[in-house]
């Protein structure tokens, strides 16, 4: 899920023993957790799969009693922890498959800026940060200022954004990437946003400092400072506010410091 840690999953099998993955989560009326949204996303994911992108094949979507269910192909592998340079190299190449020339009527930039200035449905929440601590309030003020200073039309629409492209949504067997999962947040947008997400979360995955700097340089070569600042502000708000709601104060303080560190770089 785009807001993180919000879904459940189990492996199921049919009468013939064919195994699939069943995911489900509580719907809350948000823009990203409806049956209609999932049905809009699946053609986007299938478009990627047609290019060789290792996302799971979608089998079924259903809803019942405020729960949303997704049945999909079970892919091999486990999240790569530690995240190694060989994994990052493959993920950067897979990210190229997300590139395409397709307009969205300004939807991507408006959506991204809105998450900064007012928040989103169920994630990027402002109140938890404002109430958490002076450090949380300071980060929120910084994020809002970035959102207000960002021209939505200037944020590139260059293909498809997975929108939750961190190492725990990657599967690998040894050095080889075998899958990209949790694609329910995919949307027309900027594939480079996903590389910012990967970078922002890469220290948690154990990627070394030198390798993080290499990925950062790649991003600086591809996008201007204003775009990277907006993307990092989104990730800072998203992870810090989620932590303020769901984690202890020490964990939240760590995310707050991590966020300020990355924002200071742009």
What are these regions (language model features)?
Residues 11-13, 24, 60, 71-76, ...:
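Conserved hydrophobic "DFG−1" position in protein kinase catalytic cores
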Residues 15-17, 176:
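Glycine-centered tight beta-turn/hairpin loop motif at sheet-sheet or coil-to-beta transitions
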Residues 158-161, 171-215:
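Active-site Asp-x-Gly
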Residues 1-14:
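ATP-binding glycine-rich phosphate-binding loop
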Residues 19-65, 78-94:
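A conserved alpha-helical element in kinase catalytic cores
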Residues 164:
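Conserved catalytic-loop position in the HRD/HxD motif
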Residues 56-70, 74-138, 145, 152-158, ...:
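A cross-family kinase active-site recognition segment
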Residues 193-223, 233-249, 260:
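Active-site activation/catalytic loop segments of kinase-like enzymes and analogous catalytic loops
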